[in-house]
Swiss-Prot record:
The lineage of its organism: Bacteria, Pseudomonadati, Dictyoglomota, Dictyoglomia, Dictyoglomales. PANTHER family: PHOSPHOPENTOMUTASE. It catalyses: 2-deoxy-alpha-D-ribose 1-phosphate = 2-deoxy-D-ribose 5-phosphate; alpha-D-ribose 1-phosphate = D-ribose 5-phosphate. Isomerase that catalyzes the conversion of deoxy-ribose 1-phosphate (dRib-1-P) and ribose 1-phosphate (Rib-1-P) to deoxy-ribose 5-phosphate (dRib-5-P) and ribose 5-phosphate (Rib-5-P), respectively. This is Phosphopentomutase. It comes from Dictyoglomus thermophilum (strain ATCC 35947 / DSM 3960 / H-6-12).
Length: 392
């Protein structure tokens, strides 16, 4: 029986990539800089796995005999967003980044969208979703104009009050936007952001829905599903892959629910992969430049690790990595172009080795495809033979 849990700590990078300057990310190191800002960060369980052997994290000592294989991975695709990172982990490398809109969407996009939905839009700028409904919610209620906004990610977001634009109508608008946003403006995701409440007290409802660009060719998830493995997505995995290649999806509102979902997914897994995204590091702390929050979230995850590790049988795998950086100590509130950590654990490892610096996140996807013994056309170079040495 082959089983693996792959956990992506969203935004938890481990040092600038050689091309970081092109992205204005020189000096970014999410893990190390967070630890420095806090005067040290104790992550004993990831420490035992070899986290500080990748790059020393102040407060987490290096381990003489790490219980996991450890290394770091470079991103071969251009860009530094979640979709790019997760697709590359799953074996796809992009040749151009998804478009982002730091100054809002161009006139031709907005005009085409307004014409198609038969009403004007307001906003059209990068913004925090909670802030923009505070700012424009009342005007939206008076006019019925939907609020369009973006973020540092490649997203076209539409916010609307549920009593002004019913949710099904909002979803229809998102489908229209998805059809318009193709070619040079093919954003990774169009997102419906319904809200309710009254001026001064607006709040978002759980009926958010993502309209994602599907991966342009088969990913690890597709190959596993085709070969009758279970592929369970936890968190925003379903959104990032447009629902493709999954046999079940579990969603959550925060990391602690996400960790509970790992246990629920494990109980449902016969044989296959649980692919987990824990987003709080990025969404709540990286984008808000909150190193204290980032540190606490990392400690909370580290505290939960022993119970996750106890789930595994002798030849199961637990993999911990990230999709990009989001250094909370830099002036930027955007993602950062960083290496990501790579820790691979199995309870029956007799010995472990460094995995070095992998030239693409796809090495991980290729290795997992090999582990599950599925024929594939993924990018990357498998290091399964190295991992198998651990069981000998």
């Amino acid at each position: 029986m082959k089983r693996a849990i792959l956990i992506v700590l969203d935004g938890v990078g481990i040092g600038e990539l050689p091309d970081a300057a092109k992205y204005n990310d020189e000096g970014s190191n999410t893990l190390v800089n967070t630890a420095k800002a806090l005067g040290g960060l104790s992550l004993p369980n990831m420490g035992k796995m070899g986290l500080s052997n990748i790059e020393e994290i102040p407060g987490t000592p290096k381990e003489d005999n790490p219980i996991a294989f450890y290394g770091k991975m470079a991103e071969a695709s251009p860009g530094k967003d979640s979709t790019t990172g997760h697709w590359e982990i799953a074996g796809l490398i992009l040749d151009r980044p998804f478009p982002v809109y730091p100054n809002g969407f161009p006139k031709e996009v907005i005009e085409a969208f307004e014409k198609a939905i038969g009403r004007k839009v307001i906003g059209n700028k990068p913004a925090s979703g909670t802030e923009i409904i505070k700012e424009l919610g009342e005007y939206h209620m008076k006019t019925g104009y939907p609020i369009v906004y973006t973020s540092a990610d490649s997203v076209f977001q539409i916010a609307a009050h549920e009593e002004v634009i019913p949710v099904e109508e909002l979803y229809r608008m998102c489908e229209i936007a998805r059809n318009i946003l193709q070619g040079e403006h093919a954003v990774a995701r169009v997102i419906a952001r319904p809200f309710t409440g009254s001026p001064g007290n607006f709040y978002r409802t759980p009926r958010r829905k993502d309209f994602s660009l599907p991966p342009f060719k088969a990913t690890l998830l597709d190959y596993l599903k085709e070969n009758n493995y279970d592929v369970i997505g936890v968190g925003k995995i379903e959104d990032l892959f447009a629902g493709r290649g999954l046999t079940l999806s579990l969603h959550q509102d925060n990391n602690s629910e996400g960790i509970k979902n790992i246990f629920e997914a494990w109980n449902k897994l016969r044989e296959g992969l649980i692919f987990v995204n824990l987003v709080d590091f990025d969404m709540l702390y990286g984008h808000r430049n909150d190193p204290e929050g980032m540190g606490k979230a990392l400690k909370d995850f580290d505290d939960a690790l022993p119970d996750i590790m106890k789930l595994l049988s002798d030849f199961d795998l637990l993999i911990i990595t990230a999709d990009h950086g989001n250094d909370p100590t830099t002036p930027s509130t955007d993602h950062s172009r960083e290496y990501v950590p790579l820790l691979i654990y199995s309870p029956n490892f007799k010995r472990t080795f460094p995995l070095g610096i992998r030239s693409t996140f796809s090495d991980l996807g290729k290795t997992l495809a090999d582990f599950f013994n599925v024929k594939n056309d993924l990018h990357g170079e498998s290091f399964l033979s190295t991992i198998e040495e651990g069981w000998k």
